[in-house]
């Protein structure tokens, strides 16, 4: 176990086109096999599609989508005696942001459109309108936390 204390958070540089750290995080989530240029192409073309379809600033639409996906509660397993309880806990802001980006990319990959850029653009548009699989995932997470509210006193 390290004696130096907790590791420092890596400060992410904003992306070169939009100047946004959120877009840079999304590029890193889309990244597969270290092919960052392909991930950048996917994200930038998806944001161009969002701009064409909505006539709004694509980063603002992306942030609105992430706000609609971002969970405030989740359940964590806690073993007490012989039983394992699903204990609802509040989600820290950093983890909430990570979960929203992860769900956005995962459910984009699961969509049926032809290219990944189309899938990502449509998932962003759906999420910004409060629709889509990623928003449903957040609602399911909140329902699970609500259903297990009785075990909230096991929180740590």
UniProtKB/Swiss-Prot annotation:
It holds the Pfam family Ribosomal_S7. GO terms for molecular function: rRNA binding; structural constituent of ribosome; tRNA binding. InterPro entries: Ribosomal_uS7 (IPR000235), Ribosomal_uS7_bac/org-type (IPR005717), Ribosomal_uS7_CS (IPR020606), Ribosomal_uS7_dom (IPR023798), Ribosomal_uS7_dom_sf (IPR036823). GO terms for biological process: translation. GO terms for cellular component: small ribosomal subunit. Coiled coil: none annotated. Keywords: Ribonucleoprotein, Ribosomal protein, RNA-binding, rRNA-binding, tRNA-binding. NCBIfam families: rpsG_bact. Part of the 30S ribosomal subunit. Contacts proteins S9 and S11. One of the primary rRNA binding proteins, it binds directly to 16S rRNA where it nucleates assembly of the head domain of the 30S subunit. Is located at the subunit interface close to the decoding center, probably blocks exit of the E-site tRNA. Belongs to the universal ribosomal protein uS7 family. This is Small ribosomal subunit protein uS7. The gene is rpsG.
């Amino acid at each position: 176990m390290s004696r130096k204390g907790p590791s420092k958070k890596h400060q992410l540089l904003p992306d070169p086109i939009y100047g946004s750290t959120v877009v840079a995080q999304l590029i890193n989530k889309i990244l597969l096999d270290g092919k960052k240029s392909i991930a950048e192409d996917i994200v930038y073309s998806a944001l161009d599609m969002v701009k064409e379809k909505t006539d709004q600033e694509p980063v603002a639409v992306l942030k609105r989508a992430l706000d609609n996906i971002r969970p405030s509660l989740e359940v964590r397993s806690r073993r007490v005696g012989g039983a394992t309880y699903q204990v609802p806990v509040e989600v820290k802001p950093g983890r909430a942001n990570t979960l929203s980006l992860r769900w956005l990319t995962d459910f984009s990959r699961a969509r049926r459109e032809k290219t990944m850029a189309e899938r990502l653009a449509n998932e962003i548009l759906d999420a910004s309108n409060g629709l889509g699989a990623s928003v449903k995932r957040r609602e399911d997470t909140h329902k699970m936390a609500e259903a297990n509210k009785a075990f909230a006193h096991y929180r740590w």
